[in-house]
Amino acid sequence: MTQTLSQLENSGAFIERHIGPDAGQQQEMLNAVSAESLNALIGQIVPKDIQLANPPQVGEAATEYAALAELKAIVGRNKRFTSYIGMGYTAVQLPPVILRNMLENPGWYTAYTPYQPEVSQGRLEALLNFQQVTLDLTGLDMASASLLDEATAAAEAMAMAKRVSKLKNANRFFVASDVHPQTLDVVRTRAKTFGFDVIVDDAAKALDHQNVFGVLLQQVGSTGEIHDYSALISKLKARKVIVSVAADFMALVLLTAPGKQGADIVFGSAQRFGVPMGYGGPHAAFFAAIDEFKRSMPGRIIGVSKDAAGNAALRMAMQTREQHIRREKANSNICTSQVLLANIASLYAVYHGPVGLKRIAQRIHRLTDILAAGLQQKGLKLRHAHYFDTLCVEVADKAAVLARAEAAEINLRSDIHNAVGITLDETTTRDNVLQLFTILLGDDHGLNIETLDKDVALDSRSIQQSMLRDDAVLTHPVFNRYHSETEMMRYMHSLERKDLALNQAMIPLGSCTMKLNAAAEMIPITWPEFAELHPFCPPEQAEGYQQMISQLSDWLVKLTGYDAVCMQPNSGAQGEYAGLLAIRHYHESRNEGHRDICLIPASAHGTNPASAHMAGMQVVVVACDKNGNIDLADLRAKAELHANNLSCIMVTYPSTHGVYEETIRDVCDIVHQFGGQVYLDGANMNAQVGITSPGFIGADVSHLNLHKTFCIPHGGGGPGMGPIGVKAHLAPFVPGHSVVQIEGMLTRQGAVSAAPFGSASILPISWMYIRMMGAEGLKQASQVAILNANYIASRLKDAYPILYTGRDGRVAHECILDIRPLKEETGISELDIAKRLIDYGFHAPTMSFPVAGTLMVEPTESEGKAELDRFINAMLAIRAEIERVKAGEWPLEDNPLVNAPHTQNELAAEWNHSYSREVAVFPAGVANKYWPTVKRLDDVYGDRNLFCSCVPMSEYQ
């Protein structure tokens, strides 16, 4: 025997599963790029002065089975109490058909944001359904396709109210005192950076305050009271005040739509439509507004347009509002939202339909009525007469009640003076209600559910007559058709087949890191020990979560070279915002709050300037030189010019041009010299892990896209996680939380997300990835990502010029193909190439970012040589097709590129093109053919004829 037992045990087996090319294929690619070894290649590409001598010590790799067992033991420390805490979070019943066929299905969770609508019609339809649910329940005209959570949606509502307000001199925002505390927390954080004054008072006093541009009300208050705000809203609107209302999807099934009462903006959490609490997330927020404000709305909006054949097709509408185009002038910095969770909520509505949803809502309310009746019968006082699912119960001996609840493994809301809060949900049973009677009244309460049920059924007044919904909702056929599991399963599969995800092909999107989301990483997110915890449960019930988060934080600290990590931001854009706030608060602590200039290279991600604007900073653009690098002379000149007011620089590394800039430490030194801080955008961290680190380079703070580098799937546009790493001097200034004390974080700052640890239930994905890869595996992943990019660049450079390279003609983990010379010469554009790739079975690379007229390709380490070669061969074949256009063999107005993509319907129809059917639809052969269901979208038509709700079923046929 030549192998040792340790070798046979092969603890690093997962590394070989995660990294696409095996050792032999890696050597073939190294030969193709004229490099002797991976280490030699990295030595040629990464500046010597920033290379780590040794990879960060995050432990050795574990097998999938060992890592799962280890995590199972950790999560076993969590205590699964029944939580009636409420405050915007409730237990749910996720239908198994949705769990199995969507949440656990890579055809859904590995797709990207639907920028390429032709390969995204399935999830676009599901998102359109989500918008329809929102429109029906809120009674408004326009809805978005989800925001990050309810609290950030409230902050977005405030910002939007100011944008659309006609009261230009007003600078005060009124918040009703019974909104959820975490909502108020996030609103206050956002208001401070915008310079708004937040007034918190009883809603009835909203009219007493002057210079108010917007008011935030909550239809069902945090402690349960249903409010009829119709008269107040009418008076506020007479004063031209913008009215936002926080609402609850399940309550809205029974309650009057806020839009019908005059609200301008309505938002809330869609969590209770089938999405587990997950210790705080991820959850989709819904957001709706009146038609007049549609172009000021934040987030993605799905609209109905037409394709080149005149058929109805879906797309993301009005993208000119968004950060990737408008930069610092964008309505919001929102990029990743919560598509996967919004689609769960929309499918929950489809599966239950209006009748099923009403039955669920009525059952919740009936059990709440029964609980209320029994408590009142025994002499307890309810603080509110009108309620849906939440009771505020006054108790004489609160400590004793809470002790009995704890003994019964039940959580009640405990932060209300002389009272406890109890929120029921769709999982609540009559036995649960009897148990609550015992806790509040003692064992001998003598109450009978059947008797109480008869009483409240005859005379329930807990929802005032004026607040009962009197209109039909979810009348569209899609919500009234798929109620058997067979029909639902087939409907979801029909949507999935329309889309292109990683389970079918490589997605070579530059700056997006579409790597493997391994099955072993995904398994823990559905474990009930992770899924069922309330984010505000006592910390001793979440010791497993705390241990997992602590370990993950420690690993990220070591991988980034920082001193602390804050897990709260629930997207990369939120991470940017949180990091910039830390910088801002740091300057304020030194009596330098005037420092508000943020330097941003011209090549930056659109979120950077949008986030800087949100953080109350002024953006100054730094030029790039002819090689795409930061122009040091321009940087120094602008840093010196703004020395007294310089706050920071936001820089991405490797750069968005796909190059390791040799002068990155000089950049850091210049900014530090003039009193600024260095924010290093973590979007390209997949080219750093194990090789270098932001802290080692000299940065002060970064966000990490766990949904890129650390394997959380993109979910078709979310969820994401954007924790920030900081140096020690910034650690006191990371986000805190008003409800939960974050252990180990000595911060007094406000929150940026609703939950203290953001989307905590997807953190196990990144924990599993790091645990299974270990230090050496993580470094190897970065190395192979760089090798794969250089292999593609080397193979394609003669057909498509590589726009930017570093020394020795190398690129980092992505490369930019310059299509501009081809377009000028032949008339074929980067858009034509992107759409033609669909016929070859590929999602397009990133178009026209960071340079217009280009395609940016990032293969990641997970793609094997065979798939890389398939992509390369497709690009070379397309280049040959362009030559045929150039030669006049195919006219510019009728060729397979400008007509791409081609559908089955087109194949079966009369053929009048200058090229054959075979060339159109089978350019790469017939094996594993992906069929788009629509032709190229008409973007102009879609924005000029905005239609953002469900279309007739005939359009789906």
Swiss-Prot record:
InterPro entries: GcvP (IPR003437), GDC-P_C (IPR049316), GDC-P_N (IPR049315), GDC_P (IPR020581), PyrdxlP-dep_Trfase (IPR015424), PyrdxlP-dep_Trfase_major (IPR015421), PyrdxlP-dep_Trfase_small (IPR015422). Keywords: Oxidoreductase, Pyridoxal phosphate. Its EC number is 1.4.4.2. It catalyses: N(6)-[(R)-lipoyl]-L-lysyl-[glycine-cleavage complex H protein] + glycine + H(+) = N(6)-[(R)-S(8)-aminomethyldihydrolipoyl]-L-lysyl-[glycine-cleavage complex H protein] + CO2. Disulfide bonds: none annotated. Its cofactor is pyridoxal 5'-phosphate. One of its GO terms (cellular component) is cytosol. GO terms for molecular function: glycine binding; glycine dehydrogenase (decarboxylating) activity; pyridoxal phosphate binding. GO terms for biological process: glycine decarboxylation via glycine cleavage system. The keyword Oxidoreductase applies. The keyword Oxidoreductase applies. CDD domains: GDC-P. It comes from the Bacteria. The modification N6-(pyridoxal phosphate)lysine is found at residue 708. The glycine cleavage system catalyzes the degradation of glycine. The P protein binds the alpha-amino group of glycine through its pyridoxal phosphate cofactor; CO(2) is released and the remaining methylamine moiety is then transferred to the lipoamide cofactor of the H protein. Belongs to the GcvP family. The glycine cleavage system is composed of four proteins: P, T, L and H. PANTHER family: GLYCINE DEHYDROGENASE (DECARBOXYLATING) (PTHR11773:SF13), GLYCINE DEHYDROGENASE, DECARBOXYLATING (PTHR11773). This is Glycine dehydrogenase (decarboxylating). The lineage of its organism: Bacteria, Pseudomonadati, Pseudomonadota, Gammaproteobacteria, Enterobacterales. The gene is gcvP.
